[in-house]
Amino acid sequence: MADTSADTANALSAADRPEDDGWRQTHLGRLLGHSMRRFDERVLELMAHSPHAPLALANLAARAQVSAAHVHITRHLSLRGSRLVDLAHSAGMSKQAMGDLVGQCEAWGLVTRADDPRDGRARLVRFTPVGLDWLRAFRDAVAHAEAEFRAEVGIDVATVLMLGLEAYAGPTASA
C-alpha cells in the first residue's frame, strides 16, 4: 500500500514536525528577495518619472515595460563594454536569456553590439549615448531609493545592513 501524505505526516515524530511554519515566510533569504524586489520596483518607478531618463525609456518604465531583468544590464554592463557571456555570468543569467534582453535593449537604443577589438570573433555589448543617459538616471534613482531606505529604517540600521551584506556577498559583489 502506498504512503499517503497523511500517513507520512503521522509517521513523523513530534520533534520532526514543525509546529510553526512561519519561519518559511520570515527567513533571511525570503526577506532579502522581497527587499530586493521592493527596491528594484522603487528604482523603476523613480526612473519612470526622472527628468534625466531618456523620454522614450521613461515612458516604457512608466508602462511597466522595463523590468528588473532590464536593470541587470544597467547594473552589470561595463562602461568599456562586455561580452555577452560575461554579462550573463555577472548577472546570474543564461547566455540565451541575456541575449534576448540585450536584443530588446538594443531595439530601445540603450545598447549596441560592436566587434571586440581584442578578438575578431567576439562582439561587445556597449552603452549608446542614450544608454549612458539611462545609466546616469539609474544612478540618481538608486541614490534616491537608498536615501528613502535610510529614512525608513534609520541611518544606523542602514549602515550596519550595508556592511553586513557587503561582507556576506563576498568579493564577487563588487566585481
Can you annotate each of these PLM segments?
Residues 1-65:
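N-terminal leader segment of winged-helix/HTH proteins
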Residues 28, 39, 91, 113, ...:
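Non-catalytic interaction surface on structured domains
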Residues 103-162:
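Charged, amphipathic alpha-helical coiled-coil/dimerization segments
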Residues 32-35, 39-50, 91, 134-152, ...:
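Alpha-helical linker/hinge and terminal dimerization helices associated
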Residues 43-94, 170:
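N-terminal helix-turn-helix DNA-binding core of bacterial DNA-binding proteins
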Residues 69, 101-104:
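Carboxylate-rich helix-loop segments that flank metal/cofactor sites and access channels
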Residues 27, 72, 133:
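Active-site phosphate/pyrophosphate-handling residues
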